[in-house]
UniProtKB/Swiss-Prot annotation:
It is an enzyme of class 3 (hydrolase). Keywords: Hydrolase. The keyword Lipoprotein does not apply. It comes from the Bacteria. The active site is at residues 21, 24, 74. Catalyzes the hydrolysis of N(4)-acetylcytidine (ac4C). Residues 7-93 form the ASCH domain. This is N(4)-acetylcytidine amidohydrolase. One of its GO terms (cellular component) is cytosol. SMART domains: ASCH (SM01022). It catalyses: N(4)-acetylcytidine + H2O = cytidine + acetate + H(+); N(4)-acetyl-2'-deoxycytidine + H2O = 2'-deoxycytidine + acetate + H(+); N(4)-acetylcytosine + H2O = cytosine + acetate + H(+). It comes from Shewanella sp. (strain W3-18-1). The keyword Hydrolase applies. One of its GO terms (molecular function) is N4-acetylcytidine amidohydrolase activity.
């Protein structure tokens, strides 16, 4: 079943709205989106809507395969990105990279 909305931590809101963050890394349960799909975006903490995004692509990627390019698309350094992923998805190796644009 396709996701009908997506949430982000509030700390990422400005990066998303400014276009600095153009991907999100998710686990398998949050990977059910397709290119072209439009999703409302809300904050994880309070479920407050702040924009809509259009999905560009969804690709599997392993934690060990993450590069500086992925980190740049997340508007972070690679060590910061790995730390955030470990905090959100402890012990998870298989991730899904969802590319998007803000509408």
């Amino acid at each position: 079943m396709l996701l009908s909305k997506i949430t982000f931590f509030e700390r990422f809101e400005q990066d998303i709205l400014s276009g600095a963050k153009t991907i999100t890394l998710r686990d398998e349960t949050e990977s059910h989106v397709v290119a072209g799909q439009i999703l409302p975006v809300s904050t994880f903490e309070t479920d407050r809507w702040f924009c809509d995004i259009q999905i560009i692509d969804v690709m599997p990627v392993k934690l060990t395969e993450l590069t500086d390019v992925h980190a740049e698309q997340e508007n972070m350094t690679l060590p910061q990105l790995r730390s955030v992923i470990a905090e959100i998805y402890p012990g998870l190796e298989q991730l899904y990279m969802i590319s998007f644009v803000v509408l």
